[in-house]
């Protein structure tokens, strides 16, 4: 069984040391970036990841409800309900969430990318975006399989509605696009309404001082 905590603890995470008025303080790199209101969604999306991302979003809202949150995405997708918990929290909190795909935003990762604030959804030039309909496998009694199939259909319709809301496409166009695995370049994703801009470098106004 997949253990996200074990995976995290056995992955080398760089530490950074910061000088403060009280001396030195060490952070793991992701905690240090969280101080700058940067959240990473990296790897498969599952319950272990989603509750950490949701907690970070709520923490940053409590810290400053008026300051933007930046979400960097490199994910092949994962569990639909886990992804929707992150998506719903992004929509729920007061701070605007900008999204940037680095590498790939596939399946549920693409939903989170599209769910960023309009005008603040970005892609690096060599990233890939993939959309498709949800899938699942079930076993057991025929009646239970039918129940799960009906629930999958409801989730599919809900995801279609989310894409319609954030891309500006019609329901029919979304259904056609998601019928099979549909890979898009950043240029294609921008034309489809999935992202707003393709960025190759930081603007001068974004340079660290």
Curated annotation (Swiss-Prot):
Q: Which Gene3D superfamilies match?
A: 2-enoyl-CoA Hydratase, Chain A, domain 1
Enzyme Commission (EC) number: 3.4.21.92
Q: Does the keyword Coiled coil apply?
A: no
Any GO BP annotation: protein quality control for misfolded or incompletely synthesized proteins
Catalytic residues?
107 (nucleophile), 132
Give the record's family classification.
Answer: Belongs to the peptidase S14 family.
Please give the function described in this protein's UniProt entry: Cleaves peptides in various proteins in a process that requires ATP hydrolysis. Has a chymotrypsin-like activity. Plays a major role in the degradation of misfolded proteins.
- Output this protein's name: ATP-dependent Clp protease proteolytic subunit
């Amino acid at each position: 069984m997949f253990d996200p905590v074990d995976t995290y603890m056995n992955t080398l995470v760089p530490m950074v040391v910061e000088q403060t008025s009280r001396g030195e303080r060490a952070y793991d790199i992701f905690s240090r970036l969280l101080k700058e209101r940067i959240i990473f969604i990296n790897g498969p999306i599952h319950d272990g990841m989603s509750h950490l991302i949701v907690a970070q979003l709520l923490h940053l809202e409590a810290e400053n409800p008026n300051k933007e949150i930046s979400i960097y995405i490199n994910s092949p997708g994962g569990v639909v309900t886990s992804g929707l918990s992150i998506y719903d929290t992004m929509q729920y909190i007061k701070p605007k969430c900008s999204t940037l795909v680095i590498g790939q935003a596939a399946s549920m990762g693409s939903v989170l990318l599209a769910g960023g604030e309009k005008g603040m959804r970005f892609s690096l030039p060599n990233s890939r975006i993939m959309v498709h309909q949800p899938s699942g496998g079930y076993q057991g009694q025929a009646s239970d399989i039918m129940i799960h199939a009906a629930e999958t259909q409801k989730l599919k319709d809900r995801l279609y509605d989310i894409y319609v809301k954030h891309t500006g496409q019609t329901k029919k166009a979304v259904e056609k696009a998601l019928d099979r695995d549909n890979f898009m370049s950043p240029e294609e994703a921008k034309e489809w309404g999935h992202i707003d801009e393709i960025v190759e470098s930081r603007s001068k106004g974004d340079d660290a001082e």
